[in-house]
């Protein structure tokens, strides 16, 4: 499988700790401008203070009640709906120049494959769900499928922004205030909750960086291949 990136140089992986959402968003824009001007591909790995981010398709009933929750809601330029970010969740923002012809669906599938691989290495089987983005723990014994990682991207000038969020050891109660990603008939989970042991962000950070690099460069085979599409964003 070929690389989906337009340049062969190494991805600049930056591990940033905890970063305010607005600051990280501006950094993404600056890096995207630099990439369009000939700079390197970059992968930001970080955590955010508690924040809800609403994509362009978020409906009023999916939002938190502002009188009950003091967590800020940020309107973003990605597609999709609302989700939560906060401590214990690893967020990845790949700022990548995509090769022609653009296939954003294939790009998203590669991010999913990287997340599936890392979960499997930890001993957790995860998969895709048809018609729903992100990575899921399959339902069983009357328990619904549970989302463990969200993906929401934007592509402009053939360059990606936003990315993925993997729940490691985070406050799952924060998702109860919203309809996560607009999906009301499924749950949300974390690596720690599913594996019955503490899995911290630092435990998966390096593995995620390696898997994302391998997936984008074609070293990690896709278990599900898309047909080319003109999608510009998803969540």
Swiss-Prot record:
Main subcellular localisation: cytoplasm
InterPro entries reported in the protein's UniProt record: aa-tRNA-synth_II/BPL/LPL (IPR045864), BPL_LPL_catalytic (IPR004143), Octanoyltransferase (IPR000544), Octanoyltransferase_CS (IPR020605)
Pfam families attached to this UniProt entry: LplA-B_cat
GO cellular component terms listed in the entry, alphabetical order: cytoplasm
Subcellular location: Cytoplasm
Site (Lowers pKa of active site Cys): 147
SUPFAM superfamilies per record: Class II aaRS and biotin synthetases
Residue ranges constituting the BPL/LPL catalytic domain according to the UniProt record: 37-220
Reaction equations catalysed: octanoyl-[ACP] + L-lysyl-[protein] = N(6)-octanoyl-L-lysyl-[protein] + holo-[ACP] + H(+)
Key word Cell cycle present: no
Catalytic site: 181
EC number: 2.3.1.181
GO BP annotation list: protein modification process
An example molecular function term from Gene Ontology annotations: lipoyl(octanoyl) transferase activity
Chain positions recorded as substrate binding sites: 78-85, 150-152, 163-165
Function: Catalyzes the transfer of endogenously produced octanoic acid from octanoyl-acyl-carrier-protein onto the lipoyl domains of lipoate-dependent enzymes. Lipoyl-ACP can also act as a substrate although octanoyl-ACP is likely to be the physiological substrate.
Family: Belongs to the LipB family.
Full protein name: Octanoyltransferase
